[in-house]
Amino acid sequence: MKFIDEVKVFLKAGNGGDGCSSFRREKFVEFGGPDGGCGGDGGNVIFITDENLNTLLDYRHRVHLKAENGKPGRKSNKRGESGSDLVCKVPIGTQILTQDRVLLSDLEQPKQSFISAFGGKGGRGNATFKNSLNRAATEFTCGEPGEEKTVILNLKILADIGLIGLPNAGKSTFLSRCSNAKPKIADYPFSTLEPIVGIAKINNHEIVIADIPGIIEGAHKNLGLGVKFLKHIERCKALIYLIDGTEKDIYSVYTLLSNELSLYSKKLEIKEHFILITKSDLLGKDEVQEKCQYIREKTGKLTLHTGIDQELASSLKAAQKLVELHQPGNKSRGKYNPLEV
């Protein structure tokens, strides 16, 4: 399924039904009086989250969303039926923005809903205008028009851990080995063109891990795959910086990644993370230990290493600890020691 994380849609809520102007006509009733009913209200346009969705693909070509109009009032004081609401399902993590990118709602919870466009009120029938001075009222009102607006649906992935690294750093390989995800793996840059989510199981717990497409220098300026996917990192509780162990200067790679995230958003600069040296099976044991020690001393961050199947358990254990520290109500929250697993 193609991953679509932003679409623009036009919303049209239902119009209210017109009020009715009529008079009671019944045998032996000479002055029946007004009996026109009110019109029904127009339907609303509602967005609701669905746990089974992970893309906005359904709205790529379905750009006009229109709710049902209210029915007009009828004689005998019968109110018109209200129009049905249009309920649109979106993935968890969807933001609803105005055309000027002002946030209207952030749908982060399962079954969370938001009324994006309100239907118009039904018009009044002539029966509602009857009073002691106007016993044969003929006036009525038309229904109000429903709201019309254009909004932007912006999806930001909800994940516990985000995998950050340069192209070909081994993010997809790591995700495929520790979770149920099957990302494309190749020996050329940018084999991952869209975020991929997998679920890793450790100690009877599940951790949602997102593989973010490779970041290059200038990504915050829209170079490479640009800022399109950097937004998905914002919702991750913690990050893993994956650095290719065969790089000559692994600290410069760490600095590049850290700077790009910081330039995109200051919130990412303070997000908890640890470092994972990948492709360690291509290096000698002593060289691996030296590089881990070097980057640990330079950054003060926990540094682990992994190969094709090496050291997955310790990496996942560290990831699980980061996630647990960010759970609401955890008394240890904010007391993370970056040098402890």
UniProtKB/Swiss-Prot annotation:
One GO location term (cellular component): cytoplasm
OBG-type G domain residues: 159-341
EC numbers: 3.6.5.-
Keyword Hydrolase (UniProt): yes
Primary localization class, coarse: cytoplasm
Protein biosynthesis recorded as keyword: no
Enzyme class: hydrolase
Record key words, sorted: Cytoplasm, GTP-binding, Hydrolase, Magnesium, Metal-binding, Nucleotide-binding
One annotated GO molecular function: GTP binding
PROSITE patterns cross-referenced by the UniProt entry: G_OBG, OBG
Subunit structure: Monomer.
Protein name (Swiss-Prot/TrEMBL): GTPase Obg
Encoding gene (name): obg
